[in-house]
Amino acid sequence: MADDTSNDAGQKASSAMWGGRFSAGPSAVMEAINASIDIDQRMADQDIDGSLAHSRMLAATGVISSADAAAIQRGLEQVRSEIHAGDFPWSKALEDVHMNVEARLKEIIGEPAGRLHTARSRNDQVATDFRLWLRDACDRIDAMLAAYQTALVKQAETHADQVMPGFTHLQTAQPVSLGHHLLSYVEVAQRDRGRFADARKRLNESPLGCAALAGTAFPIDREMTASDLGFDRPMANSLDGVAARDFALEVLSAASICAVNLSRFAEEIVLWCTRRFGFATLSDAWSTGSSIMPQKRNPDAAELVRAKPGRIIGSLTGLLTVVKGLPLAYSKDLQEDKAPVFQAIDDLELALLSMAGMAGDLSFFPEALEEAAGEAYSDATDLADYVVRELGKPFRDAHHISGSIVKLAEARGVPLAELSLAEMQSVEPAIDETVFSVLSARASMMSRTSFGGTSPIRVREQVAIWKDRLGC
């Protein structure tokens, strides 16, 4: 039995693409820990694209014949078709996507398949695949963020004139336009798009041709493969080309910030849909019920988006820990780079699709919003501004006067507008009847006409700008 096992191991070693130096194959546990195919097969398209570009370059530079290159390219497209059709025979024994594709290519075209890996290592191959995959992910996320923005802009246009309470410390602060509130998240999403665009720009350099770590003695044309694959340029240092993973960390950082930003609006949706707030509701498409309480209507989609940053930040922290302290150039530790990235991107994309859906689905309750906007003396700042503007008082004095009048209204249990003129004049004799024109939530909202302010005039201006930017 031992002899049979030894022979099997020897066969495994000799059949592996790296097996020439080995006389025995890996143990089953070694094979299990070493295999990454369950994860990195997601990069099959990128792997094939990279191999196609590499084969074209090898033929153009005379490293391989045009006939071999044509066979390789024909075979790779057949491999791609099999993968897309779900017919591809993935094998854990072949470790990863690169070995699986190459092994199947050899079955299809024979000896020319062995020429494909000339002037290339799995080190530069996987770095190329990973950059291509992340570039595609950045583009998908940008489109999803734009769809989320579009949903918000449409709601903002509809609700530009709707007054609602603005909050600080989750306490009623000043009245604002609901449209203005929603547009704030459009601005946030634009910064998220900028972060992904910046990350995409920095990752869009080609490591292909860096080989294992030192480059190659073959007369390759790295500019050609970089251009063929849509990269801006080849990476200038072969060690950096195979060792760098900061591009993945940067995308994960952008994803973490984006997820946190989404979670803030998700939390507001949760609050707004409670009976305590009563500002909005989600349709059945974005709600669930309870297994025991028949009356429940839960905003589970928003709650799950609120939770996603925990997983995505965890992915960032995990990869930072993997990369920390690694010496140049490649170490097998870097095989652990893709799982956290794929998970984080999956989570973020699902969160973005959910937030775009909920943003467009929200139905608001105008009466509840307007009533809440006028509570808790939200027009006190308007009273202070009136004292500055009409009575010429310094703002600090006006602040004290307004605070004293609020205290008087609190003692009587009435809003500011229900105090008598005489009561206000007991605090500041110069106040006259014109003060009542500023004492309402709607008047407060309408008066904030400064650039970036909450006046519906300014909100509609910003809506027009965003509709033009987004083409919606």
From Swiss-Prot:
The reaction(s) this protein catalyses: 2-(N(omega)-L-arginino)succinate = fumarate + L-arginine
GO biological process, one term: L-arginine biosynthetic process
Single GO cellular component term: cytosol
GO molecular function, one term: argininosuccinate lyase activity
Assigned EC number: 4.3.2.1
InterPro entries: Arg_succ_lyase_C, Argininosuccinate_lyase, Fumarase/histidase_N, Fumarate_lyase_CS, Fumarate_lyase_fam, Fumarate_lyase_N, L-Aspartase-like
Keywords: Amino-acid biosynthesis, Arginine biosynthesis, Cytoplasm, Lyase
Stored Gene3D superfamilies: Fumarase/aspartase (C-terminal domain), Fumarase/aspartase (Central domain), Fumarase/aspartase (N-terminal domain)
Places the protein is found: Cytoplasm
Primary localisation category: cytoplasm
Pathway connected to this protein: Amino-acid biosynthesis; L-arginine biosynthesis; L-arginine from L-ornithine and carbamoyl phosphate: step 3/3
KW Cytoplasm (keyword) present: yes
PANTHER family on file: ARGININOSUCCINATE LYASE (PTHR43814:SF1)
NCBIfam families on file: argH
Family membership: Belongs to the lyase 1 family. Argininosuccinate lyase subfamily.
Protein name from the UniProt record: Argininosuccinate lyase
Species name: Maricaulis maris (strain MCS10)
